Amino acid sequence: MKIERPRGTRDFLPDEMERRREIEKRMRKIAESFGYREVATPTFEYLELFTRKSGEGIIEEMYVFKDKSGRDLALRPELTAPVMRMFVNECSVMPKPLRFYYFANCFRYERPQKGRYREFWQFGVELIGSESYLADAEVIILADKILKDVGVNFSLEIGHVGIMRHLLKPIGEDRASKVMRLIDKGDREGLESYLAEIRVNEDLRDKIFSLLELKGDESVIEEAKEIIDYDFGHLESLSALLRDVGVDFTLNLGIARGLDYYTGVVFECYAEGLGAQKQVCGGGSYELSSLFGGPVTPSTGFAIGFDRVCEACSVEAGEKSVVAVVSFKGLESQAFRVASMLRERGFTAVVDVMGRNLKKQMSFASEMGVKYAVILGPDEVKSGRVAIKNLETQEQVVVAEEELFSILQ
């Protein structure tokens, strides 16, 4: 009986892997051009790292297990917490800000559907040590540039969780956190019900829903000032800078985060054509270091859903020029020697390892889409020459071995 792959996982064949590597390469190059350096953390961590950040409820969505000593471990469901754990363990005394990026697989036990898998990849950055609007601007500009460079058609929405949190102060932290979770889920009915349950007065209720409706250009800040007495300077400065550098965005004061460690600016990117799973990037400012035993350290960052970007973007893998070195029986060592020379010059060269005759070697090369075949026969080997055949045009020339490289360029 065949063994199938686990539900919610995928196999990637060479064509798809080459495309994914091209997209990944572009993301890495852009992040590095902003001064970000790659970090990596373990595939599994102590379970407490994620429950301390997100609460016990997240366990239902995680792959959790005990090691042989009975310690509770989990496959990482995301990468911000591991990177911040690494910061507290290894980097907290380094000069700030720190600019890190990562690319890795994550695991969540969710119902598989289009755009949502149990094993998935994230590309993300963390800018650690600044609470300035300039830090928020940098990571938003970086996310915007990455998505544009790989050809995703998307919209960018920016909010600020501090505004709603300030409005909710009268109901206390625990109740405010539940309200934020309901807003984050988009559960308006549940929100209405909960506000009634905790007897929020009509004035505060109206202000909450009025704030949630504010979406548009910078004029929404002026409207928000009519609803709440709050210092909007950070958001105003950020908006002005982003406009100055040509980033297109919409302010959406209805964006929330259900997790208390988000502190200020938040943003989301939505791609066209992905249906319900259209969010391809999410980020914002947060403070996690102190939760993990480190110093209070303001940070900001984002994570890109790499699989969704692959589905939404227009990048194709670059064509590789593959050369097949084919030979008559008894000339295998010469074929391996010529192939090695080609590889040293930067070509991709393949030789027959099946013991096929010349005709079958040529047929296989054509089936594989190879453009050129370098043919070694007894006469060519004796005279230090090779035959080069263009398998697309069927043209063939015989040249001195040293001329081979210039013809294949």
From Swiss-Prot:
Gene Ontology terms, MF aspect: ATP binding; histidine-tRNA ligase activity
Protein name from the UniProt record: Histidine--tRNA ligase
Protein's GO biological process: histidyl-tRNA aminoacylation; L-histidine biosynthetic process
InterPro entries in the cross-refs: aa-tRNA-synth_II, aa-tRNA-synth_II/BPL/LPL, Anticodon-bd, Anticodon-bd_dom_sf, His-tRNA-ligase, HisRS-like_core, HisRS/HisZ, HisRS_anticodon
Origin species: Archaeoglobus fulgidus (strain ATCC 49558 / DSM 4304 / JCM 9628 / NBRC 100126 / VC-16)
Enzyme Commission numbers on file: 6.1.1.21
Enzyme class: ligase
Entry GO terms, CC: cytoplasm
Entry keyword set: Aminoacyl-tRNA synthetase, ATP-binding, Cytoplasm, Ligase, Nucleotide-binding, Protein biosynthesis
Organism ancestry: Archaea, Methanobacteriati, Methanobacteriota, Archaeoglobi, Archaeoglobales
Catalytic reactions on record: tRNA(His) + L-histidine + ATP = L-histidyl-tRNA(His) + AMP + diphosphate + H(+)
Family indicated by similarity: Belongs to the class-II aminoacyl-tRNA synthetase family.
Compartment(s) where it occurs, according to its Swiss-Prot or TrEMBL record: Cytoplasm
